[in-house]
């Protein structure tokens, strides 16, 4: 696993009802991009030093933005379908 400042650390939820946890990598403690990373967690704004486990992935800011846009599109499509089903 390699990362750079500005990448996102995503910890996958263990089950379908658990959301992913996402944090912005604000410091990389090694010269080669390997862990540990200093991460600011999105949900809590808490800053912690993290050595990621096997349930973690590093994504670039561009990849995260694309994933966010896909999620917004899916949400909009579901919302539109609900409104259409209601007849409004």
Swiss-Prot record:
<dbReference type="InterPro" id="IPR015035">
    <property type="entry name" value="DUF1918"/>
</dbReference>
<dbReference type="Pfam" id="PF08940">
    <property type="entry name" value="DUF1918"/>
</dbReference>
<protein>
    <recommendedName>
        <fullName>Uncharacterized protein Rv0569</fullName>
    </recommendedName>
</protein>
<dbReference type="GO" id="GO:0001666">
    <property type="term" value="P:response to hypoxia"/>
</dbReference>
<dbReference type="GO" id="GO:0009274">
    <property type="term" value="C:peptidoglycan-based cell wall"/>
</dbReference>
<dbReference type="GO" id="GO:0005829">
    <property type="term" value="C:cytosol"/>
</dbReference>
């Amino acid at each position: 696993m390699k990362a750079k400042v500005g990448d996102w650390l995503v910890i996958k939820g263990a089950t379908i009802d658990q959301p992913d946890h996402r944090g912005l990598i604000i410091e990389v403690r090694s010269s080669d991009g390997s862990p540990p990373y200093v991460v600011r967690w999105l949900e809590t704004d808490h800053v912690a030093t993290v050595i990621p486990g096997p349930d973690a992935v590093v994504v670039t800011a561009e990849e995260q933005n694309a994933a966010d846009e896909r999620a917004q599109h899916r949400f909009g499509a579901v919302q539109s379908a609900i409104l259409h089903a209601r007849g409004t």
